Amino acid sequence: MDEVLFYVSAGDQSDTKKPAESFAYISSIHSSKQYETFRHAASPLNGTAISGVGLGERIFTSDNKKALVNVYTYGKESIDQRIPIPEALTALHIIHHPTLPHGAEAKGEEFENSLATHDKPNYRVPWLLCGGSKLGKLYIWELASGDLLCVKEAHYQGITRIDLSLCGTFLVTGGEDARIMVWNLADLIAIYGQAGLINETDSSSTVNRSGKPYYSITDNTLPITDFTLNQVGNLADLKLYTASKDSTVRIYDITTKQQLTTFILPQPVTCLARDPANRQLYAGLANGLIKTIPLYKFNQHTSVLEAVGGLDRIITVDQEDPNMLSTFVQHENHKVTKLCVSMDGTNLISGDDAGQVFVSDIATKQTIKSFPSLNFPISDLYVETVPVDLLVNDKIRTDKKHRMMPPLKRVLASADPVDHVLFMDIPQESVNTIISTKVHKDLDWLEKKKMEELLFKNLSDVNSTVKTIDTGANGGHNQQSTANLELKLSKVSEAYTDLRSKHEQLIKEHAKLLDKLAEGK
């Protein structure tokens, strides 16, 4: 396994006829290995979406100046497709297909615990492509068909970032109008077979798609620069962390629609990253510093790890940090544009407006690796852990089954499900499905027994192990041993009784002697 980083820049923003060439790379963060290079790759901040790393995966970048989406395929250096769209986009995000195996829906199992029963097809595309424009419009396309499922006036100004919750329920957008909108994804794309939405008097069967946001956040005063969601499958624990140019980082509970905590920082916050274990946040500032915001704090009086903030508290992050215990200074004098954290939470990857990308050790705050500079502001970072053989597979270079994506349509899709034509490559069922399912069930059984043992021991110092006595072939020997033990016990009892009687007799004689001495006096 290797942990790789995809990084891309915003490219040359000048109006020259021949702008400087820009690149994007996929490199290891633990070694000097560079796996892939993509030429002419550039996008605005948060304007890149990557489906993954390996055979059949794609990279989508929005053009800085034109209404185009450039598509790259893994293993090919140049642009694979240029897809025209209604207007230039400033933010992109892809949504993958739900991965539910047979019977998982009926059993009510969580999707992250489900077991895939089919291999990945050679030709595959993500499920949806979401894009935000400079005018604040939200576009959602179905990539397999190219249908435009949604066009929404989501913000008054340009959209800066789009993201989806891990459970796939909520789509979150942030904009330059200082607002964050939380949408129900099902409401945005549910256009097929909706009773009461089709206008029977209209021959074109137009649909009323005026869906309202689930939650509208208007607490900020300056544009939203970044936000992140904690990766939980349970909606009750879903939290939203936002960053803004008004120098604040805010935490919201999506389910209760309440603001939990506000952190005030000394400089405008340009980007935000979250620890995989939700232990702390990392805020990139406009002056090049990266501040660590702990979400838990050790209470010295009670010796308990307590959550920081809550109940709409306002906490000021101290600007003075002479010992650099909570500050990264690798990008000093350069605005930090993107942040991300490694899988194990030990390394922080950061990029700035000078095109520099560093990997820093979170514990020591030291730089452990630097990547070749892209000379333009870093617009996106993506970290993934993949097998090494997948990165250097020769099949990537000779993928004959690769097909082009359909063009993205400019008009909304019809509400009639008959008009919905979808082409997908469905592979055969995996040969190891039965074996994998059996192994999966065995692991579930072992996990169940482990929890039962934990509950039985009750987390105490009492040893609850039940000892068993073998009553098999050695039954006769055990009976003889029992008889010998009973004989010894009877002898000990007789000796004890004799000793006790002698002791009582001596006590009586001693009492008589004391009485005689008393009478003599």
Curated annotation (Swiss-Prot):
Its main location: nucleus. InterPro entries: WD40/YVTN_repeat-like_dom_sf (IPR015943), WD40_repeat_CS (IPR019775), WD40_repeat_dom_sf (IPR036322), WD40_rpt (IPR001680), WDR18/Ipi3/RID3 (IPR045227). The keyword Membrane does not apply. WD repeats lie at residues 106-151, 154-193, 219-262, 321-361. GO terms for cellular component: nuclear pre-replicative complex; rixosome complex. It holds the Pfam family WD40. Keywords: Nucleus, Repeat, Ribosome biogenesis, rRNA processing, WD repeat. GO terms for biological process: DNA-templated DNA replication; rRNA processing. It is found in: Nucleus. SMART domains: WD40 (SM00320). The keyword Electron transport does not apply. Component of the RIX1 complex required for processing of ITS2 sequences from 35S pre-rRNA. Belongs to the WD repeat IPI3/WDR18 family. Component of the RIX1 complex, composed of IPI1, RIX1/IPI2 and IPI3 in a 1:2:2 stoichiometry. The complex interacts (via RIX1) with MDN1 (via its hexameric AAA ATPase ring) and the pre-60S ribosome particles. This is Pre-rRNA-processing protein IPI3. It comes from Lodderomyces elongisporus (strain ATCC 11503 / CBS 2605 / JCM 1781 / NBRC 1676 / NRRL YB-4239).
